[in-house]
């Protein structure tokens, strides 16, 4: 017996939900629950945010935000990227309810529950909706894949391991020691 396909979840449906936790995203009209991240994941978020804010204090070219914060990319795509950068030129997309449109830079930190979305459909949607640069951070491999989405959404422009200093084409003068991103507050 055929079952009727449920209608897509829209931005309006999403906004009527109670505030989290648990946290959800809408990916191509599908409601997807985001499990709570692990401690190392949160260390990476904090480290990246700290490094980006240090850069922005000296180079006030935009604002950095962290999850949970809604990014409304379309009526059926509402994401909560781990770290977000919006340039000063595009500051008008920042609202009380989240971000209305594509940020300039999105950072997704992989976790077992999100890897297929982060590396698959979300990457493609980011490219389609105008995100310029995407960093996919892999805590297991301690590596960062950098995508220049306006040029090539399928192949990373670079992959950096924990031994390098990397730069962003989007943020002139930014130099990040990759190892600094992977500092953990847990003793090993």
Segments predicted by a language model, with ranges:
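Gly/Pro/Ser/Thr-rich low-complexity, intrinsically disordered segments predominantly at protein N-termini
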Residues: 1-188
